[in-house]
Amino acid sequence: MLDISIQELIKQWQKYLILQKNYSNNTVIAYNNDLKHFLEFMNYYNSELVTLNHIKTADIRLIRSWLAKRKCENFTASSIARGLSTVKNFYKFLEKTLLLNNHIIFSIKSPKKAKLLPKGLSVDDVLISLEHIEEYGNVKWVELRNKALIVLIYAAGLRISEALSITKLHLQNLEFIKIIGKGSKERIIPWLPLTKNLITKYLEILPYKLDENEPIFRGRQGKKLQPSVFNRELIKLKRIYGLPEYLTAHSFRHSFASHLLEYGADLRSIQELLGHKSLSTTQKYTQTSIKHLEAVYNTAYPIKK
């Protein structure tokens, strides 16, 4: 249980994340779940209703006990690190709005995350997906929507949240699309004729009237399409055609980067297209490319035979 004043603070924090920090709804939901888990543990730890004073006086033992509990509950290192980052974010908000300081929180280092390489699809997997995704919509406009979404993500390297935020206003420029990504970072991506043609065909048969600033990708009931709904369409696809288990909407973004690198694009350009703040994030794809080259070498290099 939480004190009513704490509940109100959490609502203000969520508004701050959306309006000031430009976080996506999915990110805010994840952050809210992390904070809820932390405050529930604080409630258990102190054996009483959490108040602002409990938050202000939280010590290093409490934080470390909470992190240990998450580890015991089989949270991944990445999830544990994100949880701590969420708590720090909340405390920064309190420091800014209430002048509430708790520097102990910021002294705790995040657990080391396993460095997982991004998993992209092969070109063949992408082509199979494009060829067969239209078989699972049952309604023509849904089938076209699914295909247009895959092409958009793969051809432009968009995050699923970015793709699902595309409006008719984005279609007005014939040469490029302007994306506002994480942290309000703006990037410009060229339109491919195939992408725009598919989206245009989809909009021509979409049974719902949309304003120019409304997201164009809609669910069957006319509401904004949710990532989970689209990923369910992909689950059907990969089960029937034996596609990789890691095939998701986001895997097409990874494939965009990996395939550009394999075909000679430079890292800086890929960084700009993906909207990565740091080049080190983009450099993960060089490891993926090296793995690909090693596989080709091991199976095809004539001297090895």
Curated annotation (Swiss-Prot):
Domain Core-binding (CB): 4-95
UniProt keyword terms in alphabetical order: Cell cycle, Cell division, Chromosome partition, Cytoplasm, DNA integration, DNA recombination, DNA-binding
InterPro entries with a match to the protein in the record: CB, DNA_brk_join_enz, Integrase-like_cat_sf, Integrase_catalytic, Integrase_recombinase_N, Integrase_SAM-like_N, Tyrosine_recombinase_XerC/XerD, Tyrosine_recombinase_XerCD
This protein's record includes keyword Heme: no
Intracellular or extracellular location(s): Cytoplasm
GO cellular component: cytoplasm
Gene3D superfamilies assigned to the protein according to its UniProt record, in alphabetical order: 1.10.150.130, Intergrase catalytic core
One GO-annotated biological process of the protein: DNA transposition
Domain Tyr recombinase as annotated: residue spans: 116-298
UniProt superkingdom: Bacteria
Presence of keyword DNA-binding: yes
Location (main, coarse): cytoplasm
Record HAMAP family: Recomb_XerC_XerD
Function, in words: Site-specific tyrosine recombinase, which acts by catalyzing the cutting and rejoining of the recombining DNA molecules. The XerC-XerD complex is essential to convert dimers of the bacterial chromosome into monomers to permit their segregation at cell division. It also contributes to the segregational stability of plasmids.
Subunit structure: Forms a cyclic heterotetrameric complex composed of two molecules of XerC and two molecules of XerD.
Protein name according to UniProt: Tyrosine recombinase XerC
The organism's taxonomic lineage, starting at the top: Bacteria, Pseudomonadati, Pseudomonadota, Alphaproteobacteria, Rickettsiales
